[in-house]
UniProtKB/Swiss-Prot annotation:
Cellular localisation: Secreted
Signal peptide: 1-18
Cystine residue pairs: 30-126, 80-132
Pfam families for this protein: IL10
Record-given protein name: Interleukin-10
Organism expressing this protein natively: Saimiri sciureus (Common squirrel monkey)
Gene from which the chain derives: IL10
Keyword annotations of the record: Cytokine, Disulfide bond, Glycoprotein, Secreted, Signal
GO CC terms in record: extracellular space
Function: Major immune regulatory cytokine that acts on many cells of the immune system where it has profound anti-inflammatory functions, limiting excessive tissue disruption caused by inflammation. Mechanistically, IL10 binds to its heterotetrameric receptor comprising IL10RA and IL10RB leading to JAK1 and STAT2-mediated phosphorylation of STAT3. In turn, STAT3 translocates to the nucleus where it drives expression of anti-inflammatory mediators.
């Protein structure tokens, strides 16, 4: 078992343990989740701010990668799946490649990835925010474009990470209002 998967399992199991006379920590954290959302998004933005200039300078493409269609998927019935797929895409495909582009930014990209993993873990604990199964065409288009662009695709995806955070915020705002 990979050490990161083992760590996630341990964190999950620790959060599930019931406190005497109370619901689980997971249930309690879910009631506070909407209130902690602005702080979590701010942490993502601050972490991205440490690498934003590097990747935006390297991004030589004029086209947008994260288009309005992705935001519409986030806001529509595919919102859950689009969010889940995009988080997975950044964690498994974009960030591992981005870490290898410059030793000076590796630590910062890694930190950004850890914050995104923590965010995903909290979303999964609170099932009403991430209960999904369907696939998003907009996410498939983003993945396809990055794959075709190769190294330039990594720069593009990382340079637009702030847009991704904005889309997360739009999705979470919609979910907390429902």
């Amino acid at each position: 078992m990979h050490s990161s998967a083992l760590l996630c399992c341990l964190v999950f199991l620790t959060g599930v343990r019931a406190s005497p006379g109370q619901g689980t920590q997971s249930e309690n954290s879910c009631t506070h989740f909407p209130g902690s959302l602005p702080h979590m998004l701010r942490e993502l933005r601050v972490a991205f701010g440490r690498v934003k200039t590097f990747f935006q300078k390297k991004d030589q493409l004029d086209s947008m990668l994260l288009k309005e269609s992705l935001l519409e998927d986030f806001k529509g019935y595919l919102g859950c799946q689009a969010l889940s797929e995009m988080i997975q895409f950044y964690l498994e495909e974009v960030m591992p490649q981005a870490e290898n582009h410059d030793p000076d930014i590796k630590e910062h990209v890694n930190s950004l990835g850890e914050k995104l993993k923590t965010f995903r873990l909290r979303l999964r604990r609170c099932h009403r925010f991430l209960p999904c199964e369907n696939k998003s065409k907009a996410v498939a288009q983003v993945k396809n474009a990055v794959s075709k662009l190769q190294e330039k695709g990594v720069y593009k995806a990382m340079s637009e990470f702030d847009i991704f955070i904005d889309y997360i915020e739009a999705y979470m705002t919609m979910k907390t209002q429902n």
